[in-house]
Amino acid sequence: MYCVKYDVALVSEKFQLVAFHKKMDDELHYETSVIPIHFNDQVIPFSNQASHLGLVRSAEHGNLVSIMERLAAHRRQLFSLLPAGLAFHHCGNPAANIRVQHIYCLPVLMSGLASLVLSKAEIKVISNYYKTNLIKQMKLLHRTPDPAIYFLAGTLPAEAQLHLRQFTLFNMICHLKQNILNKVAVSSLSVSYYKSTSWFHQIRYLCQQYGLFDPLIMLNNPPSKGHFKDQCRSKIYEYWHKKLTSEA
């Protein structure tokens, strides 16, 4: 019906099917091999991973494949700026290097990650990679304490950068009153499950962590984008400043 309404042509050669299951067991093998899916008299094979909207979804490795794709894209973007003065032998200003990295490279690293439900281990992979890049750009020792790295760089850790983008995405959903995502958010947050791992419940945990209003309240009364962004930025900066200062 969607294809007929919007005049969309489906090409079987471009289809990619990925089967997700909690355990890679015989049941998944049965679903993918014994029950094939046909389109235009052709069998659509199942893949271990597929790309959608710039993100790679994997049936075996969770979000790690998408994260590694973002790290590789960030590395390519960073290397493309080396001739502009970021290379070590250019002896460029570390502060300028950090600023250029923040403007041109950080968005590439964080692109799409805010929409994923990341585990603590996956967030740690991103944080360690980002911290290592800061150390190299500022020419610091590898054992430099975290507070010194982020205070000298004048930037937030990768985890905080990710939280900022998650709040921005959630605020956008709050203003989409008739959108299916808004309805799913209200439905998900109205029923509270213990240790729920959904994306919207992660937003609720982040609101509690930073002392923000409950996300269900914001869905019913969406704050203005500018005010909400300033409030989130202020709360996140305050939280991480106290955390890093206490660790120093």
Q: Across the structure, where does each feature detected by a protein language model lie?
A:
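Acidic, serine/threonine/proline-rich low-complexity intrinsically disordered regions
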Residues: 116-124
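Basic, alpha-helical interaction scaffolds
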Residues: 36-117, 172, 180
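Charged boundary/loop elements
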Residues: 13, 111, 116, 173-248
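Short, conserved micro-motifs composed of acidic
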Residues: 8-48, 69
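Short, charged alpha-helical motifs in flexible N/C-terminal segments and linkers
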Residues: 7, 16, 132-194
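Short amphipathic alpha-helical coiled-coil/interface segments
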Residues: 74, 126-137, 203, 236
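Catalytic palm subdomain of template-directed nucleic-acid polymerases
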Residues: 1-4, 22-27, 59-63
